[in-house]
Amino acid sequence: MAQDTQTNTAVQGKIVQCIGAVVDVEFPRDQMPKIYDALKLEGSALTLEVQQQLGDGIVRTIALGSSDGLRRGLMVSNTANPIMVPVGTATLGRIMDVLGTPIDERGPVSTEKYASIHRKAPTYDELSPSQELLETGIKVIDLVCPFAKGGKVGLFGGAGVGKTVNMMELINNIAKAHSGLSVFAGVGERTREGNDFYHEMADSGVVNLENLGESKVAMVYGQMNEPPGNRLRVALTGLTIAESFRDEGKDVLFFVDNIYRFTLAGTEVSALLGRMPSAVGYQPTLAEEMGRLQERITSTKVGSITSIQAVYVPADDLTDPSPATTFAHLDSTVVLSRDIASLGIYPAVDPLDSTSRQLDPNVVGQDHYETARAVQGTLQRYKELRDIIAILGMDELAPEDKLTVARARKIQRFLSQPFHVAEVFTGSPGKYVSLAETIRGFKMIVAGECDHLPEQAFYMVGTIDEAFEKAKKI
């Protein structure tokens, strides 16, 4: 601890400037806090985190909480440690904020184990690449952009195309069937969604309200209404809890909703810290900040972290620096398309834009690979023919092209699926489709075994057998 040797008390400084969430604090010149040290405001629960050393004993900090009421001259003490948050099984079933303080009105988190939210990423020789597939039960994902156990997945989409609903369905299908533990970090999203998620988890038994220790998920929220410091650091708090479980040898699912808000909070803080903005107004340190977070989300020889991250795409522009920087770190990218959503096909995943490193015959097998590529080839051909159809109509197409279009439209509809978490809105029960059934269904459509069925029979069904049943009623 950075202690004053005479009085054996923590080193104190005083506030000399406040600009929004950024606070400058003056300390004795020979006892300046280190970068990332947490400072406590005397007589208040407010924590400040050191970002820059300006010289002459002055450090520039960001406030992890509201800076209302701060003024020059207030005393601040240096804890001489980074932000420390509770980790381990005591966090299960609890909702915490960026500092690890519980916000679920169920008393304090009773644990002796605390960890710093800043730590180095595992070294190269500690890493453990995984080839094992993670079945999600969602046809379009399992077919064209399969997830790897211990991999990183991004759900990309603009406003209102279904990122959070897809995330909730993945949690429903994976976290409930998953024997390991989950950590959910709500980064700058709506408080209502955090509340819905908590109740959904409680109803399904993933959060055990009678005995919290038997819960399987820990939740960390820093929502939209909170200051930028909270939104910037809350992803690290959630990650620290996930890393702690991983280092105990567990397989962890780490959900982040939404990584874009993490970048945006960094942009707000960066401007207040006086850094010159770079492209589109983002912080100049965007790639480094993103890299520091993403490099820690990884699997080691001890345990695995499988991460699923929602990524908001501003103005549906995937070349925007924030989503573009995120792309580089992911194993699978699930791109949600407004065009597909406007056709009423949900999940609105674009099978031609979504990718996965796992879609390799050596990993998924020849059968799966060939079926996925045949589906993408059929859809790509349909996309090329759409201009001709729009100008000349279907009648001008060659017979084989007419057949391709008919199959592509069936594939498009068969890629839709009723979700468990959307039962309230759709009125139809959710479907979980196994990978084997998914491959069988698409193989039959591509091979022409379903050419006699009307295309509406394929809309919002689970397996191919359900499409045959539905066709009988049409």
Swiss-Prot record:
It is a peripheral membrane protein. Its EC number is 7.1.2.2. Keywords: ATP synthesis, ATP-binding, Cell inner membrane, Cell membrane, CF(1), Hydrogen ion transport, Ion transport, Membrane, Nucleotide-binding, Translocase, Transport. It is found in: Cell inner membrane. Transmembrane segments: none annotated. Produces ATP from ADP in the presence of a proton gradient across the membrane. The catalytic sites are hosted primarily by the beta subunits. Belongs to the ATPase alpha/beta chains family. This is ATP synthase subunit beta 1. It comes from Albidiferax ferrireducens (strain ATCC BAA-621 / DSM 15236 / T118) (Rhodoferax ferrireducens). The lineage of its organism: Bacteria, Pseudomonadati, Pseudomonadota, Betaproteobacteria, Burkholderiales.
